[in-house]
Amino acid sequence: MSAVKKALDLMKAEEVEYVDIRFCDPRGKLQHVTLIADLVDEDFFEEGFMFDGSSIAGWKSIDQSDMKLIPDASSVYIDPFYAEKTMCVHCNVVEPDTAEAYSRDPRIALKAEAYLKASGIGDVAYFGPEAEFFIFDDVRYSVTPAKVAYQIDAEAAAWNTDAEVEMGNLAHRAGHKGGYFPVNPVDEAQDLRGEMLSTMKRMGMKVDKHHHEVATCQHELGLIFGGLTEQADNILKYKYVIHNVAHAYGKTVTFMPKPMKGDNGSGMHVNMSIWKDGKPLFAGDKYADLSQEALYFIGGILKHAKALNALTNPGTNSYKRLIPGFEAPVLRAYSARNRSGCVRIPWTESPKAKRVEARFPDPSANPYLAFAALLMAGLDGIKNKIDPGPASDKDLYDLPPEELAAIPTVCGSLREALTELEKDHDFLLAGDVFTKDQ
């Protein structure tokens, strides 16, 4: 049965009233327009929907504003929050006169997957992102000619041990950097995260766990690995669910990498593997039971890490996180199990689970662009046999200053990242996956 037929059958079975067509803007934000379900038939999935591209930041000028959304029928799901039964579908953006993919559509991740197959290196790339976030009770900000400020607060925050609370301060709080894995009542968000995970499961997402993270008010939910574009779609759904469930509880969520000074920031560690002919390409007999191809893949990521920062760490706040300490992976080194380098090989007994984890990305990244860029860097490493050098199995932050100074780092600012991308972007242009217009 075709994807379109399945989508139309879902509409009928669920008695759908509306269809929400969604797409991703250059910043990684989900956008949408809602249509009466009566307008959606088989032709709609082929003909698409026209919209004003000049109203999306970074896209068209007003004199060339017409653009078209083409729904991807394989991406449909029922929205869990709308009052009226609504089916959602993610879209690709195309030029209306040529029907060609729009060069600035973040869903170029599809082209990266096609490039992998065409290269002969592998058939499929699997991605497992781990996006952390903070939950607060109160967030205030002000940007005026006289003041620029923001303020955050949460009853569960470590700084509220002496706060006056209406029903009494029960003192069940994790201390500074003490948030990792405590049970309730210290972990006060257990049920909130559980509802988030259950909602994702009802939407058809593959999930596996949830827990409190190290920093005060910091959390993480687990996505089971999937294809590159599928997981980029899932990160958008992940954020959508987390924001909306928290909102229903009277709380607010931020995926900002470093919302407060002096505590751990939020990363989006990205686990990656490549399979070919039904077999894991990264399993072998080299360091940490990796294959030579996996080591070359790591070499590509380490070589291009500074250019990648422009896409995996795209905001000024990203570089408040990428500083020594706070478990931040600023050093361009790799290791098995060692979390102080920017690439880690998680321990596993199963060859099928052998993977590479890039630790420097953060959840402010556009997932389509970040995942596609990471894959392109790794494939460049395999194609050009880029040696990653020896692994670093020590705690790199405990090295003597002279040894630490010899280890290269990721970028320290967005300005540096953009400069590095300008100098090093040819690997992204291979197969026309990215364009200079991107």
Curated annotation (Swiss-Prot):
**Top-level taxon in the UniProt lineage:** Bacteria
GO CC terms:
cytoplasm; membrane
PANTHER family linked to this entry: GLUTAMINE SYNTHETASE (PTHR43407:SF2)
Q: How does it assemble?
A: Oligomer of 12 subunits arranged in the form of two hexameric ring.
Cofactor section: Mg(2+)
Query: Which GO biological-process labels does this protein carry?
Result: glutamine biosynthetic process; nitrogen fixation; nitrogen utilization
Q: Give the subcellular location.
A: Cytoplasm
Q: What is its EC number?
A: 6.3.1.2
Q: Where does L-glutamate bind?
A: 264-265, 321, 327, 339, 359
Please state which protein family the record places this protein in. Answer: Belongs to the glutamine synthetase family.
UniProt KW Phosphoprotein keyword: yes
Q: Which InterPro entries match?
A: Gln_synt_N, Gln_synt_N_sf, Gln_synth/guanido_kin_cat_dom, Gln_synth_cat_dom, Gln_synth_gly_rich_site, Gln_synth_I, Gln_synth_N_conserv_site
State the activity regulation: The activity of this enzyme could be controlled by adenylation under conditions of abundant glutamine.
Positions of the GS beta-grasp domain: 14-98
Binding, ATP: 208, 271-273, 339, 344, 352
Catalyses:
L-glutamate + NH4(+) + ATP = L-glutamine + ADP + phosphate + H(+)
Show where the GS catalytic domain sits.
106-438
* Protein name as catalogued: Glutamine synthetase
Keyword flag Ligase: yes
- Where Mg(2+) 2 is bound, by residue? 132, 213, 220
Residues binding Mg(2+) 1: 130, 269, 357
